[in-house]
Every structure is written in C-alpha cells, then in structure tokens.
C-alpha cells in the first residue's frame, strides 16, 4: 500500500468570515493538488497495475477499502469494514503497550497477538533500490512502514550548512563526508536533488514472547547484513505504533 498525504496550509489570521472563506478555498486547492499528485503517481506506477482504494457496494451495504487498509495495518486482518456516514470505526481489538512489546487482545476471529517494533538507529553510507529485499526472506510476519516528508530547498540547505559549520568547528577529519555534503548542497541548489525526513519501522508479530524475541533477532540480523542498525523500541513503542498510520507524522520518534 502507498499513501499520499498533503499537509494543509496554515490559516491566516483575520476576521472570522474571511478566515472561513479562506479555509474553504484552501481546502479546494489542497484537494485539487492532491488529486493531481495521485494521478501522476498512478501514471508513473502504471506498469505495476496500481488502483485507487475507494468504497464499494454489497448486498450488506457500503464498504470502505481505505478503512479496510487501516484495519489491516492495525491488527493484520484484512476484512470488510462497513462505511457509515459520520463514522470511521475499524478497530474491535484492544491494544496494550508494555516495556518492549505490545499486545492485541483476542476476539471471535483471532487469538491474542504480540508485536514488537524496530526502528532505524543508523543508516548505511549508501542506499539503493531493492536493498530491503532480504527482509522478504525472513520467515516471520511483519509490517514494514516507510514515509518520506519532502523538505523545502532553503531549510535543506540551512541544515547542510549547519552540519558543515559544526564539522569545521570540531576539526572533523571526515573529508569524504564533507565532500558529499558540498556536492549535495550544489545538487539541491541546482534543483537536481531533493531532501526530506525518512521514517522506517518494522513491526513483527508472534503468538508468544519467545517467538517474538526470535523474530526480532532475525529481523535485526537481516538489517545488519545491509548495513542498517536497528533498535527495538521501548520508551517510544506506543508512538512508533501510531506513527505507522498515514498522516501521523507527529508521532514519529526517529527520522
């Protein structure tokens, strides 16, 4: 699943009526730009046969594919979720958070499930397409979540300038890193590259704690093979869980 999100523009201060009118215009513009970005993405992914999730009619009423996706992300069950106007409920299992694991209560369809979340502590020097394919060979159920929030040109340049100044002040001898930063600055300034904040987590599921610990160890080993240092979330377990859901960027503990 791939989700596009758009952060609405901040409303300007002013009289109540003018603010409401500006909000309405802004919503229309944001929706138009989101639709345009969606069309562009669907066209770019056309060889893979993507389709836009929506609602569908059944003899039992109207059902929502977006809500089914969120429910699948929540508890790993891909099931029909009815859509009712003014209601967007898709959760029927209680989630509890412990020291380094979470628990989804059982229900009539599924038994109790345990889960743990790993986040990226350190990235490899270089990345490439297909680098995460080795995770597909890990024999455990998992949810891999990634997000990328684009950064405007000036904030990106400002961050790189700050890092370069700190390196010079500390007399850092990492010459190759300094060269890469200078090259990256040039690419961003010339519009050849964009920068942003990347978020990457892996949630593993298991029936008991022993199986869960084994799954975490196997995933960490697979990450180490590709140069990624993964850390099992403890204090940030709950925000890491909610950060998997689209639009919850404010919960991301590591990016």
Residue ranges and their predicted role:
Residues 1-255:
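Extended, folded cores of ATP/NTP-driven motor/assembly subunits in large transport
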């Amino acid at each position: 699943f791939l989700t596009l999100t758009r952060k609405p523009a901040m409303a300007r201060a002013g009289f109540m009526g003018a603010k409401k009118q500006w909000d309405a215009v802004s919503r229309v513009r944001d929706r138009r730009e989101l639709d345009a970005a969606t069309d562009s993405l669907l066209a770019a992914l056309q060889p893979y046969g993507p389709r836009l999730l929506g609602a569908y009619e059944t003899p039992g009423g109207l059902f929502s594919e977006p809500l089914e996706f969120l429910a699948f992300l929540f508890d790993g069950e891909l099931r029909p979720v009815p859509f009712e106007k003014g209601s967007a409920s898709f959760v029927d299992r209680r989630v509890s958070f412990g020291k380094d694991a979470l628990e989804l209560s059982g229900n009539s369809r599924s038994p109790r499930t345990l889960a743990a979340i790993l986040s990226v502590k350190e990235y490899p020097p270089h990345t490439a397409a297909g680098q995460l394919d080795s995770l597909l060979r890990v024999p455990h159920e998992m949810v891999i979540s990634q997000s990328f929030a684009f950064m405007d040109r000036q904030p990106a340049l400002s961050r790189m300038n700050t890092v370069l100044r700190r390196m010079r002040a500390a007399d850092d001898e990492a010459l190759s890193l300094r060269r890469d930063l200078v090259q990256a600055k040039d690419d961003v300034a010339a519009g050849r590259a964009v920068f942003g904040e990347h978020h990457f987590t892996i949630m593993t599921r298991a029936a008991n704690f022993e199986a869960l610990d084994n799954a975490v160890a196997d995933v960490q080993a697979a990450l180490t093979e590709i140069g990624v240092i993964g850390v099992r979330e403890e204090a940030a377990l709950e925000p890491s869980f909610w950060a998997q859901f689209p639009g919850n960027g404010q919960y991301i503990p590591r990016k």
